[in-house]
């Protein structure tokens, strides 16, 4: 293996995505990252590679990764990788990175990714930006992003013309957005939140031409210092906001009677076939658990219908739902910012409007 020097930036080329799989099923975040990685690779004029680890890896789904943008897929198949361990996965991924030298490494900000990413960054002596919500290498595209998401006077601000990865993430509890670069070290590493990147349509031609390459790992049982004895799935059922077709979200506007407000939201979600979401104010108050939270510090959703009940429309919340197909806002304040992004708006008391809405929907279904 050639000597690895994280500061020899010119030696690194290509965009990589760690494609997480569980029990033989590729996770949705992997397709999202491949779709985003494809854009970055196109802007840089380089190859996009997916990396898959596991035991008894199904080669059929490896080809499918090409349909979401991968030019090449490296896969590592070993009984020692059947269950995730920090030692095993970090060693194998770091060894491969040191050999192939990608300039960008993207990992999903899942429980697994949040453990694996920083471990690898530390071993490789490079930086990692966690929980990213936006990525750019093209300065012009980054400027366009800033024009729509910030108050920066882009046209009168000087930007360095380079292809460093610009990694944007929430900071200070979601009150600010910070863009971080890693100009002196490679690879540039980022973990990306599930749901913030859109998955591109499957491309049969891409799946047909992707190159699948098996890698034999230099991994032994002695390299793994933790033994997985058993895996138990949580009995707690978490709300699936990201996969929902309809989301009914509640905000600070339910503060007059939180219990009643949430009950109305649940009933409306029930008749619409959706799930209940919330703004940060609601989860911070303890009215709903954190898995219901939508926004920069919560989940990013793209449902067919998003109903905002008593949500003012703070930029941190809007960032997590503005790409919904149809946004219906109900708020007493006619000047609430939520109406700026709403497809349909109702100015009124949600405690009066929602029961009528539920009644009309039930009547229409009868």
Report each predicted region and the residues it spans.
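N-terminal glycine-rich FAD/FM-binding segment characteristic of electron-transfer flavoproteins
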Residues: 1-366
């Amino acid at each position: 293996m050639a000597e690895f020097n994280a500061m020899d930036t010119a030696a690194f080329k290509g965009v990589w995505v760690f494609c997480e799989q569980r029990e033989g099923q590729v996770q949705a975040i992997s397709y999202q990252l491949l779709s985003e990685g494809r854009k970055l690779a196109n802007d840089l004029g380089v190859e996009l590679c997916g990396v898959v680890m596991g035991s008894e890896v199904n080669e059929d789904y490896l080809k499918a990764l090409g349909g979401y943008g991968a030019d090449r897929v490296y896969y590592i198949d070993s009984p020692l990788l059947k269950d995730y361990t920090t030692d095993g996965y970090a060693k194998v991924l770091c060894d491969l990175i040191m050999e192939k030298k990608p300039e960008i490494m993207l990992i999903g900000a899942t429980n697994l990714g949040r453990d694996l990413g920083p471990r690898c960054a530390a071993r490789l002596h490079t930086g990692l930006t966690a929980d990213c919500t936006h990525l750019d290498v093209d300065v012009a595209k980054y400027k366009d992003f800033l024009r729509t998401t910030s108050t920066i006077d882009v046209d009168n601000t000087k930007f360095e013309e380079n292809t460093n990865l610009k990694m944007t993430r929430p900071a200070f509890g979601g009150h600010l957005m910070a863009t971080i670069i890693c100009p002196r070290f490679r690879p540039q590493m980022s973990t990306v939140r599930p749901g913030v990147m859109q998955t591109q349509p499957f491309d049969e031609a891409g799946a047909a031409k992707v190159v699948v390459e098996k890698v034999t790992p230099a991994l032994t049982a002695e390299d793994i210092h933790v033994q997985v004895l058993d895996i138990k799935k949580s009995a707690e059922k978490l709300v699936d906001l990201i996969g929902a077709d309809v989301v009914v979200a509640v905000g600070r506007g339910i503060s007059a009677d939180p219990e009643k407000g949430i009950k109305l939201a649940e009933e409306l979600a029930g008749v619409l076939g959706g799930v209940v979401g919330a703004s940060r104010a609601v989860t911070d108050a303890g009215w709903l658990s954190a898995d219901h939270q939508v926004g920069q510090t919560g989940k990013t959703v793209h449902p067919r219908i998003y109903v905002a009940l008593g949500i003012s429309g703070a930029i941190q919340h809007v960032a997590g739902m503005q790409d919904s197909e149809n946004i219906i806002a109900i708020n007493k304040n006619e000047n609430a910012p939520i109406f700026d992004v709403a497809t349909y708006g109702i100015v009124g008391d949600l405690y009066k409007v929602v029961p009528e809405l539920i009644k009309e929907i039930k009547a229409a279904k009868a």
